[in-house]
């Protein structure tokens, strides 16, 4: 866990009192343990170096991105996965090397394709037959592409974040021949060069079995097609711990199991080992982030429920409403026994604006207290909205006892900056 209580009973991160952060900078605020982010990246590097295989690790921008996050990614020698013009723009503004950027997405617009080509990104991840034609049409020079294929593997996770099954808006089906058609179209194109294949079977996956099965299916399929590729990218989806009972993906042993299986399979198939790519996002930043809120109204309905309302909600914490995701809350300003079961509710005008049902908190919780919601580093700020004209929160990186603001709190003026009068 990235937080702990100090001798004064205050919750801390990297030795910094989160009560002090909340009082100094306001709430809602998202704080990250910068050293934990870096260590997660380094753990992946070490695990792959031990495998002896050529590899690349790309950070999935969609989990959380901003200029300072991109700079951190560059410092730790990761590549970058983007899925929109905005994510690409952010990366370029941060000074990230374009050749180390990969552009994903099931519906890249003509403008996005041109923008990526103009900036000489590393490669496109092809998601449809039509996209092959579009990129070839707008390219003037050789363009590296990777085909996103669907191996037909269903990861055991929430149906909204499964992506490797046949019925998916993402990728090209192996079973139904779309992947083979894509290879043929790339080979017949004027400007495109096939660099490799990519697959992403889902998110919040705790074990290795689905990744191993996927790798074997794709390697065998490539062998059947008589194709040797430079890169086999297994995507991301490595799970993290949100609540007690969850298990984080075991990076060291997990990568070893996956790479051992790949080495064994390529030996059986008699093919050269491709470079192995992965795209972690959640597992890099998820557990390193915590959201701070101030407690407001407390409403107790006798024998039914007790609602503890906070000054944020689904505008900065949508995953509970979207996926029925589970979280843990801690009282920031006092270390007391969590002897009460409550519902932590957001302040937005939606009955579904619930952060945690059956949250365990001290019965003494009152207006003006601060709460920390753990493991909110991924898909929180990046999925934040201005619903109810709520302002997006500020974001800080904490390191060596100091708080560094990496995203300023959205101002009221910024809420209407694009409105016409």
Curated annotation (Swiss-Prot):
The active site is at 349 (proton donor). The gene is lysA. Keywords: Amino-acid biosynthesis, Antibiotic resistance, Decarboxylase, Lyase, Lysine biosynthesis, Pyridoxal phosphate. It catalyses: meso-2,6-diaminopimelate + H(+) = L-lysine + CO2. The modification N6-(pyridoxal phosphate)lysine is found at residue 62. Disruption phenotype: Disruption of this gene does not affect growth in rich organic media but reduces the level of methicillin resistance by nearly 100-fold. Pathway: Amino-acid biosynthesis; L-lysine biosynthesis via DAP pathway; L-lysine from DL-2,6-diaminopimelate: step 1/1. Its cofactor is pyridoxal 5'-phosphate. Pyridoxal 5'-phosphate binds at residues 237, 279-282, 379. It holds the Pfam family Orn_Arg_deC_N. It comes from the Bacteria. Homodimer. The keyword Amino-acid biosynthesis applies. It comes from Staphylococcus aureus (strain COL). Belongs to the Orn/Lys/Arg decarboxylase class-II family. LysA subfamily. Its EC number is 4.1.1.20. GO terms for molecular function: diaminopimelate decarboxylase activity; pyridoxal phosphate binding. This is Diaminopimelate decarboxylase.
